Structure formats: C-alpha cells, structure tokens
C-alpha cells in the first residue's frame, strides 16, 4: 500500500486500548441488555491503522494478524460503511492497513477502538467535518464501547457503556502492568450470563434505583490518586464470576497482587486481561523489568502502560 502524493490523502491513526477501573452490573434494562455503571480509562497499548484514500469506492482492509477477518463482520469495515451511509456518498473508498498490537478477546476494547479510529480517521480523510458527538452517536449502532473509545481518557459510562460523562482533570499520572494469558479468550456474553446466574437475584429493578447508583458513582472523585489503593468502592463485578472458573485469571491476579508497590489489582472488562496500578509509568516499568521472568514462567504476556487522555491520535505522516 503506497500513499498518494498529497498528504491529505493518507493518515495514520493510533487506537488506544481501554481498561475498566470500575465495573458494576446494576440490573437488566427493558431491552434485555445489562445496565452498567463503569469508569473506563484509555491506555497506551495501541493498534495502528494506516489509511489511504482511494479514487474508487472500494473499502479494503488488511492486517498483520491472520486471525482478523477483513470482511463485513469486522468493526473497521462496519464503521467505514456506516460513515459512508451517514453522509450518503457511496463513492468514497479507502485502503486500511491494521497493525494489531492489542490482544483479541481480552476485555480491552481492541475491536471497538479500531472502529473509533476508523470513524475519526475517515471523517478527516474524506473531509466530512462531522463533530465528535455526531460520531459518538453514530457509533452506538455498531458497538457499546466505541463512543468511549472515540474521545477516550477517563470517563464514567452508563447504560451498556455508551452513555458517557466525561471526567476532566489535568494529569493522569498512574501507570500499570497489564497481563494476559495468550492461550485464552473470555466470551463477554458468557461472562454476563454467568454473573446473572449467580447474582441476578440482587439486580436492581427500576430506573429510580439505577439513578441512585449512578449518583453514587458520580459522587466519587475519580481524579483522587488514593482512590486506587484497593478501596472497597472500586470493583469489577464480572471478576466475581469469571475468576473462579478461569484459572488463567486467578493466576494473573495472584501474580499481580504479589508485586511490590502495586495498588489496585483487577480484571479488565469481562477478562481475561488483568492489571495492577502503580504510582506512575516509571515505577510500573521498573517492576515489570524486575519480574519479567515470573511473567514468562507463568505463560503471561505483560506490558507496562501509561494512561492516556485521549482514545485516538491522528497524524498525516508515515513512520
């Protein structure tokens, strides 16, 4: 894939993964989906998408990961066609080359952040001039995590994850060690079903109760660094059902909890990725280097990551 001569005809998007700093399952909505209360955070484990504008209307995708479909079931293709339909211009085309670094089926929104990067990138490449909130609303049609991934940072997320309340503060200093056993994936629907089977009797039943819970989440100062010192109000409900039946998650959480200077240790989303928070990136990276052999012996892939204030970065150059 070669770029056109004009810079405006190609760009690169970095699509950041997310972790769940907090995840509560509140109950079942009238549409049958679970009502959630979450705090999500972008991190600098990222996929890269190279996009080149075509002179015809072909939408073409290729990737360095052979497990990834390049057909209509891929969220990148869905996002491209959704945007094209939105502006009612079927003549638009693009070549997209995906460098996949975020693990698949890991609870890190890898597919969702790729779709978010596609929407933001093509909005610029195709000169559509849609606003961010328009893209967020549009993206709800194909995925609940995509609206968050479009703007990223740290946000409170309600509903299925698509109702966003942005959190604003100057610095996000915390670092983390993220781990995943590459041999397994966890099915999100299975995780939610397991949780419902175990804890469904305690579900809240009406919007008034949901709103009380939402206000409780809103009342917390999510910029307070001390909040993440394994305090009881920070939780991932799905961890309660996934951990006992997934030895790889149990192993990951135990190893992370044993690390020096680790703060909050948790599973992300429906798993199986898990993370430990540290005071900053440098501390996380130092601990990872000192314990890399332990992760290798446990069969875990591990990354030291920073927290990001955005979900996607765009630039008009190849590297």
Swiss-Prot record:
ATP binds at residues 103-113. Its EC number is 2.7.1.148. One of its GO terms (molecular function) is ATP binding. It is an enzyme of class 2 (transferase). Keywords: ATP-binding, Isoprene biosynthesis, Kinase, Nucleotide-binding, Transferase. Pathway: Isoprenoid biosynthesis; isopentenyl diphosphate biosynthesis via DXP pathway; isopentenyl diphosphate from 1-deoxy-D-xylulose 5-phosphate: step 3/6. One of its GO terms (biological process) is terpenoid biosynthetic process. It comes from the Bacteria. The active site is at residues 18, 145. Disulfide bonds: none annotated. It catalyses: 4-CDP-2-C-methyl-D-erythritol + ATP = 4-CDP-2-C-methyl-D-erythritol 2-phosphate + ADP + H(+). SUPFAM superfamilies: GHMP Kinase, C-terminal domain, Ribosomal protein S5 domain 2-like. Catalyzes the phosphorylation of the position 2 hydroxy group of 4-diphosphocytidyl-2C-methyl-D-erythritol. Belongs to the GHMP kinase family. IspE subfamily. HAMAP family: IspE. This is 4-diphosphocytidyl-2-C-methyl-D-erythritol kinase.
